[in-house]
Amino acid sequence: MKYFVVALALVAAFACIAESKPAESEHELAEVEEENELADLEDAVWLEDLADLSDLEETRGFFGNAWKKIKGKAEKFFRKKAAKIIAKKEGITKEEAEAKVDTMSKKQIKVYLLKHYGKKALQKASEKL
């Protein structure tokens, strides 16, 4: 709501500035009136669009929840991927690897995956050379 008030104040200020310009002849006066009418129409459209965005708090909440869901799914994916890599690398069962991953922090899991895939990318790059 406060964004709407600020935008309305800016529009009013620009309208006052535009109307305060002196018009020297009738031709210029007609031209200024035409410009003001066009500006008023543009402002009306802009304010209408701004009114549609008045539900910004609700929109922010929606994307915040969506981001949290995506982040949660990514963390689950990282855990599964790390467990799979550990099981393959160390020759242990999947359950043992998952238990090992559960003892790791989120940061440790991400670092482990970055190291693993970094080494893999480096090996592929060196093979191409």
Swiss-Prot record:
The record's account of tissue expression is: Expressed by the venom gland.
Q: Where in the cell is it found?
A: Secreted
GO-annotated molecular function: toxin activity
User: What's a single GO BP term from this record?
Assistant: defense response to Gram-positive bacterium
Keywords of this entry: Antibiotic, Antimicrobial, Cytolysis, Hemolysis, Secreted, Signal, Toxin
Q: Does the keyword Repeat apply?
A: no
Q: Looking at the UniProt record for this protein, which Gene Ontology cellular component terms does it annotate, in alphabetical order?
A: extracellular region
Signal peptide: which range, if any?
1-20
What this protein is reported to do is described as:
Insecticidal, cytolytic and antimicrobial peptide. Has insecticidal activity against the flesh fly S.carnaria. Has antibacterial activity against the Gram-negative bacteria E.coli. Forms voltage-dependent, ion-permeable channels in membranes. At high concentration causes cell membrane lysis.
* Stated family: Belongs to the cationic peptide 06 (cytoinsectotoxin) family.
Give the protein's recorded name: M-zodatoxin-Lt8h
Native source organism of the sequence: Lachesana tarabaevi
UniProt lists the gene as: cit 1-11
